[in-house]
């Protein structure tokens, strides 16, 4: 983890390098931080860096490096105003990270998105490793300590693993990570990581805000699902882990997200009580708008600070 002094050093270097070009005019915070991150990574001489795209891919500020491997985890209808109205359009933007001859690893994708992405990869002669075709995942037990699954591919024999995250989708994400490591190590002529080392690493995974258990008594989970594509697996996981227990959902989102669609999803969750709230942020729905949505769907609306106190 970089400390503040190191980050300020990289930021100062960036300011000095671009002082005469007025390049900072109109830049977003994410673009500035991406540039600072690249400078920091170069200064630290790291062996590998995992850069996550901010939005889309083709025009994203992270898409300025020459990668050793690219990966696309999943695609849903999000940021449609900027990326396009359908999965095919969004897939084309995501595929902008694909580079000629550089391996591409794919997670579980809808056929519409997969067809677009694989077509672009073939055009660029980027070797493809695809979910369910080149590597397989068999979902097993779920519990509050994590998700068990088995994994196998042409590079790795079938074996059991457990990731310390909740939800079947996290098992698929873990499988994608295994495949990425195997493809990368194979490309570099290195010995693959042992099953024991991979499993040990997966047991140590921590992902704040992703079905994060923040209290056992009472049981409280924190999750950042903010679009229908993310809400669906969250609801599926809650159904599996807490089938008969009563569940209270405290929910809100920002203006650019599909509030109405997500409310319909949440109302289909059995044994649950859905409560809406608002928060202070320029992008957030106002308290009045949240109250109107609550009234329309016959839901409760609360102040989240007061709710947590009680």
Predicted regions, residues:
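Active-site-proximal loop->helix
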Residues: 1-14, 81-98, 117-120, 259-265, ...
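Acidic-glycine-rich active-site phosphate/pyrophosphate-binding loop
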Residues: 7, 142-157
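ATP-dependent carboxylate-amine ligase catalytic core
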Residues: 1-65, 83
